[in-house]
Amino acid sequence: SGRPADARTALHIDRCLSCLSCMTTCPSGVNYMHLVDEARAYVEETYERPLFERLLRNVLAYTMPRPGLFRLSLIGAKIASPLAPVARSLGATRIAALLGLVPKRMPVPERIGQPGTYRATGQKKGRVALLMGCVQSVLDPGINAATIRLLTRLGYEVVVSGEEACCGSLTHHMGLEHDALARARRSIDQWTRADVDAVIVTASGCGTTIKDYGHMLRHDAAYAEAAKAISAKAKDVTEFLMMQELPDAQGGLRLAYHSACSMQH
């Protein structure tokens, strides 16, 4: 309708987790994912958030896509975390809540996962790129390291460019389309030059965005085709493993598997 977004609209859109269950259950097949993406961008463009909210979102949007800076921020927040009760008593409940999210122990960076090419073990089956990501590479670097070990053992050469960092998913879900598209283009450039058979993702939320690059950049004449090609190559690591001939399990090990909502819908 052209009407600027208001606080009620912003709150409603902000509360959407993009689990995409609505798309699975909608009998009419409405693409709510794209509707919500457009709504987030519209809210960001037309609604002036309260000062603290603007500051918080700006800090998160600048810090979290940069792994080095995000790690330093976590260290600083960990040092300040004992002050959470003080912040709560002074009425700064949001700051107290953020301090409460700081990990009890800071993850140690893995040696495996640094930029470079990891050779396949045995006969080479193909060449894949691995998105190291921004937040996950700091909070749980062991996931990417384990993925590299597994893929190379299965015969795949793994390329870690280290230059794409954030794929744009984080700022895309904040409605910051200019930043998100710039990060998407940077990632596309890296993976296109790497000439890989697949782009492996270990964070399903990032995978959802990369698989949508073709739509996000459909009006960009310089990137539309390349974006579509990268979207077609994007695979969650679990999807990619389902395509492989895996050896029989040794037995004696029971595992629990959590299927993320963005993988189910």
In which residue ranges do the predicted regions lie?
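Iron-sulfur cluster-binding cysteine motifs and their immediate structural context
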Residues: 1, 10, 15, 19-42, ...
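Signature of N-terminal electron-transfer/Fe-S-associated modules in redox systems
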Residues: 1-6, 130
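Short leucine-rich amphipathic alpha-helices used at interfaces
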Residues: 5-6, 12-13, 56
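A diffuse structural propensity rather than consistent per-protein peaks
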Residues: 6-7, 257
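Well-ordered alpha-helical segments embedded in enzymatic catalytic cores
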Residues: 8-12, 183-186
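Iron-sulfur cluster-binding electron-transfer modules in prokaryotic oxidoreductases
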Residues: 32-265
